[in-house]
Amino acid sequence: MIPGEIRVNAALGDIELNAGRETKTIQVANHGDRPVQVGSHYHFYEVNEALRFARKETLGFRLNIPAGMAVRFEPGQSRTVELVAFAGKREIYGFHGKVMGKLESEKK
């Protein structure tokens, strides 16, 4: 078995990842002089400041790619990525420490 591998009965058909979750598509540009790689579960709002995009719109979202994968942004590169909303308790800790708890939109 490969770490992260999921074995399923082929007769069940394709598995849809993140079914029913809110997604959004954004344009991202690397204005830095070094490549920036973002992992599958990294809170996109808190990625490297060299990446330019509508940051406020990404609060509570991560890349909509399989677990363990990443997207690499080369210097000067611009690309469109799809994001998916975090699920569960919707509490964010770590990364760059910009949230450290419940997402603002859900605080009462």
Swiss-Prot record:
Keywords assigned: Cytoplasm, Hydrolase, Virulence
First-listed, main subcellular location of the protein, grouped into a coarse class: cytoplasm
Pathway in which the depicted protein is active: Nitrogen metabolism; urea degradation; CO(2) and NH(3) from urea (urease route): step 1/1
Description of what induces expression: By urea.
GO biological process, one term: urea catabolic process
Top-level lineage group: Bacteria
UniProt catalytic activity: urea + 2 H2O + H(+) = hydrogencarbonate + 2 NH4(+)
EC number: 3.5.1.5
Keyword Cytoplasm belongs to the record: yes
GO molecular function term, any single one: urease activity
Cysteine-cysteine disulfides: none
GO cellular component: urease complex
Keyword Hydrolase among record annotations: yes
Compartment(s) where it occurs, according to its Swiss-Prot or TrEMBL record: Cytoplasm
Subunit and partners: Probable heterotrimer of UreA (gamma), UreB (beta) and UreC (alpha) subunits. Three heterotrimers associate to form the active enzyme. The trimeric urease interacts with an accessory complex composed of UreD, UreF and UreG, which is required for the assembly of the nickel containing metallocenter of UreC. The UreE protein may also play a direct role in nickel transfer to the urease apoprotein.
Family recorded in the similarity comment: Belongs to the urease beta subunit family.
Xref: NCBIfam families: PRK13203.1, urease_beta
Name of the protein in question: Urease subunit beta
The organism of origin for this protein: Proteus mirabilis (strain HI4320)
Gene name linked to the record: ureB
